[in-house]
């Protein structure tokens, strides 16, 4: 069976969840441009430094080097400043999107069939509404944004290098593709099983922890504490195993990235040295095309973690959609219609139940003919044997 990065259900669920994030497009575009300029400043810093060192070795007049020296300071300061502002904007976009998604999910759950929620353990529900929503929000900052930056910066770097040496630019483009596309795809397929196992193990860990905390007394009375601890430790072992698998794949990705950088430098030398000997390229330009690739792989190196985040986010989106239901429409939280109170409503809440029957979904009735009237100031106790669902 051919390994896939995402199944069709996961891809569909991820698109569905992203639509509920209601991402501010203009802020995202601003963050994308700032991130591209930040990494572009880093590459420009490396290229300018290479030119400055090579040109200074020829001992020209100081005024010839003054512009380059000032540019080095400019690129160094702007790199840090642009990254800081970009992260402020991008994280605001992601956090606001998570808020929108959670509000929409809560509103949908409040008006949906309670059987879907009751059938889940509390820890599993907590994981889906908590960490799974976070994973979907992280997709914006850790996958979409790095991919856009890598494409923009890579194209700009190759285009600028082509002005000096088309051959070196072609080699750099091939190495960037190897580092930014081929390596992430290979490692993402290897990481998929580890990510799926990790998500399931984290949900099981949350469920086991909630069971231990909330039901400790009942577990102790029935002699099930050791069994609960064993389930908790088993979930931790599964998480650690998935982390080791992801770490191995990440190590291979880092190796391919570093190897691509080395190939780009060696390729630039193999193309540039004959060009210098043929007086097609200057010695200073040779230093630029050789050293620029050293700072050109910063954006493509982020694609490995971006692909891993893609897998995690798609799995999380699928779990959230399974909670709501694949066919259940979800309205944005701000568009939910609020039901007005009756005209004769009192200022204090009053809960009344008449001939109420209680039971689990598809199970026997536990209580029938229950009449209940709860008003402020009145105490009502719900009593019964352990395990009936009080």
PLM feature spans:
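Membrane-integrated ABC transporters
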Residues: 1-42, 135, 151, 238-241, ...
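Cytoplasmic coupling helices
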Residues: 88-103, 107, 145-149, 171-217, ...
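Transmembrane helices of ABC transporter permease
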Residues: 23, 28-37, 68, 142-197, ...
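Transmembrane helix-loop-helix hairpins at lipid-water interfaces of multipass membrane proteins
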Residues: 2-7, 19-82, 162, 167, ...
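ABC-type nucleotide-binding domain
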Residues: 340-390
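An intracellular "coupling" helix at the cytosolic face of ABC transporter transmembrane type-1 domains
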Residues: 18-25, 114, 118, 131-140, ...
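Helix-loop-helix
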Residues: 50, 54-74, 160-174, 249-318, ...
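ABC transporter TMD-NBD coupling linker
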Residues: 14, 233, 265, 293-362
């Amino acid at each position: 069976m051919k390994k896939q990065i995402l199944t069709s259900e996961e891809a569909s669920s991820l698109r569905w969840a992203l639509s509920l994030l209601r991402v501010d497009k203009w802020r995202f575009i601003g963050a994308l441009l700032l991130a591209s300029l930040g990494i572009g400043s880093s590459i420009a810093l490396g290229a300018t430094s290479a030119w400055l060192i090579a040109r200074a070795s020829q001992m020209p007049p100081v005024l010839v080097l003054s512009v380059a020296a000032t540019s080095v300071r400019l690129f160094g300061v702007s790199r840090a400043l642009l990254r800081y502002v970009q992260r402020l904007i991008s994280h605001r976009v992601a956090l606001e999107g998570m808020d929108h998604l959670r509000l929409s999910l809560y509103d949908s759950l409040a008006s949906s069939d309670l059987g879907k929620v009751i059938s889940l353990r509390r820890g599993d529900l907590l994981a889906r509404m908590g960490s799974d929503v976070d994973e979907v929000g992280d997709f914006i900052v850790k996958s979409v944004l790095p991919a856009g930056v890598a494409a923009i910066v890579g194209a700009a770097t190759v285009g600028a290098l082509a002005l000096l040496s088309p051959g070196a630019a072609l080699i750099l483009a091939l190495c960037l593709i190897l580092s930014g596309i081929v390596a992430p795809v290979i490692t993402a397929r290897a990481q998929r099983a580890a990510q799926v196992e990790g998500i399931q193990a984290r949900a099981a860990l949350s469920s086991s922890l909630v069971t231990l905390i909330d039901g400790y007394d009942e577990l102790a009375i029935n002699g099930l504490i050791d069994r609960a601890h064993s389930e908790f430790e088993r979930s931790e072992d599964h998480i650690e195993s998935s982390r080791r698998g992801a770490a191995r794949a990440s190590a291979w990705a880092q190796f391919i990235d570093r190897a691509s950088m080395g190939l780009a430098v060696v390729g630039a030398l193999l193309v540039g040295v004959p060009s210098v000997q043929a007086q097609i390229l200057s010695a200073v330009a040779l230093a630029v095309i050789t050293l620029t690739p050293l700072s050109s792989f910063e954006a493509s190196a982020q694609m490995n973690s971006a692909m891993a985040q893609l897998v995690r986010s798609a799995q999380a989106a699928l779990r959230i959609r399974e909670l709501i239901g694949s066919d259940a429409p979800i309205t944005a939280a701000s568009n939910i219609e609020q039901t007005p109170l009756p005209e004769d409503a009192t200022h204090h809440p009053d809960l009344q139940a008449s001939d109420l029957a209680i039971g689990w979904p598809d199970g026997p009735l536990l209580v029938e003919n229950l009449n209940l009237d709860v008003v402020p100031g009145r105490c009502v106790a719900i009593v019964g044997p352990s395990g009936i669902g009080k």
